[in-house]
């Protein structure tokens, strides 16, 4: 059996997307070759499911239908959609195998799109991010601010850091291990990046989704979807209409419990579609 997986994920220098090869290599032992959604065998961490929808453009639709025969198979592990409107229509791949999806919202939508009942775990594979650090660093910051890549240069992000006595601005475009280490050094996290929140959950760090702007792609679906896996209502803190949260408000806004996180880790490890190789930690 090959120890390389052909994986589709976004080509963006962003911690969330780059968790794909890191987690798959550390937890399951596979090297990862990044491929397009047309040729990849696995769709994992991220909001890539909409890429597999049948397109409305006739030329694109023809290309997809051909691809559905020439490369019919894709395994799906922990993925989701980015918009509510994405979860409509049907998939062009003829053999989509769903092992886990990001949340209950996506599970129900995929069931509707495929006409199949899915008895599978829900959760984002990024919840295994804590596996990437050999040891947990000591706490250095009372609060970490993790802007989405589109919010990095927003003056409101720098202003938010100044509102707290011991805060750290964390750049999701830095090396992912550096980003995870800095998140783990925080006692609380405020993030407009979904995977900033997921990483904090992975380390059992209280966190709160904050909104700086409308710049990030999506209509909030991916956040609603992620929290639906934990049966938690998504309640973002919009800094355009609310003052910066106090540390106690941020901590009180964290609804996910550590025992839920550990159970998701266990279920997602078990749901990975390929057996661990090369000393993967599974």
Model-assigned labels for residue ranges:
Residues 1-282:
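Active-site anion-handling motifs in enzyme catalytic cores
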């Amino acid at each position: 059996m090959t120890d390389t997986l052909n994986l589709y994920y976004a080509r963006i220098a962003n911690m969330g997307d780059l968790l794909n090869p890191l987690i798959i290599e550390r937890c399951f032992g596979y090297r990862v070759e990044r491929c397009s959604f047309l040729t990849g065998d696995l769709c994992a961490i991220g909001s890539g499911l909409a890429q597999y929808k049948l397109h409305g453009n006739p030329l694109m639709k023809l290309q997809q239908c051909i691809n559905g025969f020439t490369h019919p198979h894709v395994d799906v592990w922990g993925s989701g959609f980015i918009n509510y409107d994405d979860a409509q229509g049907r998939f062009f791949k003829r053999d989509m195998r769903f092992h886990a999806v990001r949340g209950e919202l996506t599970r129900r939508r995929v069931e509707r799109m495929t006409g199949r009942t899915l008895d599978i775990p829900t959760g984002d594979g990024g919840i295994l991010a804590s596996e990437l650090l050999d040891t947990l660093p000591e706490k250095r910051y009372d609060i970490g601010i993790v802007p989405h890549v589109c919010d990095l240069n927003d003056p409101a992000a720098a202003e938010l850091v100044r509102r707290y006595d011991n805060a750290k601005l964390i750049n999701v475009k830095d090396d992912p291990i550096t980003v995870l280490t800095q998140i783990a050094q925080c006692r609380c996290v405020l993030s407009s990046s979904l995977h900033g929140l997921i990483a904090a959950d992975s380390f059992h760090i209280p966190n709160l989704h904050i909104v700086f702007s409308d710049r990030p792609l999506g209509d909030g679906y991916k956040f609603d979807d992620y929290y639906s896996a934990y049966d938690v209502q998504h309640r973002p803190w919009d800094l355009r209409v609310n003052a910066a949260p106090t540390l106690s408000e941020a901590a009180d806004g964290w609804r996910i419990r550590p025992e839920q996180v550990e159970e998701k880790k266990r279920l997602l490890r078990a749901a990975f579609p390929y057996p661990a190789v090369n000393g993967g930690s599974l």
